[in-house]
Amino acid sequence: MSQRGLVVCRFTLCLLLTGLSLLGAAGQNKSTREREFFSDRIPSDRLQQYADLAVQWSQKYFRIDTTNPPGNEMRGAVFFKEILDAEGIENRVFEYTPGRADLWARLPHTIEPARRPVVLLNHMDVVTSDPSHWKVPPFSGAIVDDYLYGRGAQDMKNEGIAHLLVTIMLRREKVPLDRDVIFLAVSDEEVDSTGTEWLIAHQRDLLGNAEFLINEGGMNIRDNTRVKYIGVDVGEKSPLWLHVVAHGRPGHGSVPLADSAPNRLIVALNRIRAYHPPIKLLPIVEEFLRAQAPNEPPARAAHFRNMRQAIWDKNFQRESERNETLNYLLHNTISITMLGGSAQTNVIPSEAWANLDVRLLPGEDPKQFLETLRRVVNDPNVTIEPQSSDFRPANYASTDTALYAAIRRVSAHYFPGTPVTPMLLSGTDENQIYRPLGIHAYGFNPYTATQEENDSEHGDDERIRVEELRRGFRVLYDVVTSVAAKK
């Protein structure tokens, strides 16, 4: 064989060996990718069984009426306890007042050294419903056209079942945990948060100095073809409820009085309505809007990509006041929610009143905002006072944590190409109560929903797609194992 032929042969052999090596590496990488998450280790038949349980347990749980008021969350606690007892999982029920209870359960870590626990928090109470406006009874647990209907289907019995199922899976699959995983179902979130407040006051040690908490508040909106974004609740606005009272001359309704209390109240409320709190751009809002830019018309998309410049644009400032979402994200907001005056049509009262629902951005001073409103009204015959002296300052969690990184990583796996972005809620949730305890608390929802499905929360025909129930628990399982399990 010629030297040239030998060289060619050696070159060909080299290429062959290199190719085989690359194929082996590719196969190894593929195998690694396929087993990147703990759910990949579960046989498909068992995943199918878990998916069946998700639907079955959801139907049973949705049939339990925990309307608040009065709550009766003890019914939900008993439902959870029966399942947890059957699985041999440590749990305790605390009936802190008749019919109202919290349930705590724990999977202890199995690996040392252990890190701080992760809490799965959900509330068992739901808001009221009017059955006459529903397609099916709100507590029937009925499946119609591939949707499971029920009060709590979006807020948040659906997530409570995901939390429960993940806890069960961790136990059954014998996942090696280097954190305690705590399942916590509480009462009265929809009204006064007495369940969480009681637990922290009387059983705080059961939280085990937790590092992370996953709660409601996340929002993952999809259209017919794709998931538009994965929204993680990292902060909420704080409610400042105000009582406005106008004083004036009383008299007979047949003789109009220019300086009557109702007239003074109307003038005061018109001044409040005309007042536009200035824009305040929070970093989490800036990141959220930037992620929304691809879904917006060109002009708005340009603003969302450069919000620090947009907030100085007069046209955008006006849009931020007109657009409901931009308004709550960028401003302190004021809603007139209640009005009162005379008990009789022909009596001009000496007092007329209104209630305002004010929502303040994180970092805002309630006393300063109250003084601003008093200056806006500028009438010594009109008083504005807080309805309660108990003001809970708004707070938010850092996105520079292992849990937030896990949410990003898992979401990229299940929803490739979809942005994961922090969110600021217009309302409030119990994350605000847990963050001051040193816990990184996030609202993360493992399910996706169309805007219409999401809007059924607290509305008529609240529902969730059955397919979401069968899929979402796996997303949460991989998030939890990413921060609590040892590979």
Question: PLM features: residue spans?
Answer:
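Acidic/His- and Gly-rich active-site-bordering loop/insert found
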Residues: 29-151, 170-179, 356
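Solvent-exposed, polar/charged alpha-helical surfaces in well-ordered, non-transmembrane soluble domains
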Residues: 52-60, 74, 78-82, 146, ...
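Solvent-exposed, acidic/flexible segments
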Residues: 44-55, 69-77, 153-156, 258, ...
